[in-house]
């Protein structure tokens, strides 16, 4: 079973019970499983296939229109830009941030090829968490490990991004007195 890293602090029996409590879904290539900003009450586990996690941002592009006879107008054109954050394969979970925070989803998740996922209802999970404090501790410890790993990965990716332009802070010159 490839779910060892997802719920690694749970026993095999507990992991299987979680998966068995969920609804299995098959999604065709290109199918959106979760849309950014949606309310989600549960967690998905990838059983087979691969999903793409994308974060969309609103952008405004400016264009000069109606040029002619020395006249032009600046028009703002709203749009959306999606950035692939990562891909997740067999055994990976998604929707966990929304579950933990009880907040809208932070990304769109799309099937790369045909995918099978299990959706574990949040009410089912919360009932188990409320009824078994030991399970709750192991469950949240497992989520913390997953989230920590993803944060480390994001930090590594961010190291390659360098700000440019006049707003880039410069290191302080030790020879110069500090402004007070």
PLM features per residue range, with description:
Residues 1-180:
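Cytosolic regulatory regions built on CNB/CRP/Popeye-like sensor folds
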């Amino acid at each position: 079973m490839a779910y060892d890293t997802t719920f690694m602090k749970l026993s095999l029996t507990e992991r299987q019970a979680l998966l068995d409590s969920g609804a299995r879904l098959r999604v065709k290539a290109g199918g959106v499983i979760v849309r950014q900003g949606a309310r989600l009450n549960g967690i998905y586990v990838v059983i087979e296939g691969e999903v793409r996690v994308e974060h969309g941002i609103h952008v405004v592009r400016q264009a000069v229109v109606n040029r002619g006879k020395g006249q032009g107008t600046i028009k703002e054109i709203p749009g959306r830009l999606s950035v692939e954050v990562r891909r997740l394969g067999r055994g990976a979970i998604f929707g966990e941030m929304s579950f933990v925070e009880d907040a809208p989803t932070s990304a769109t998740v799309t099937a790369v090829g045909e995918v099978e996922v299990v959706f574990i209802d949040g009410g089912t999970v919360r009932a188990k968490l409320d009824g078994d404090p030991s399970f709750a501790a192991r469950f949240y410890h497992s989520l913390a490990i997953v989230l920590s790993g993803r944060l480390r990965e994001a930090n590594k990716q961010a190291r390659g991004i360098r700000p440019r332009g006049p707003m880039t802070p410069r290191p302080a010159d030790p020879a110069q007195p500090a402004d007070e």
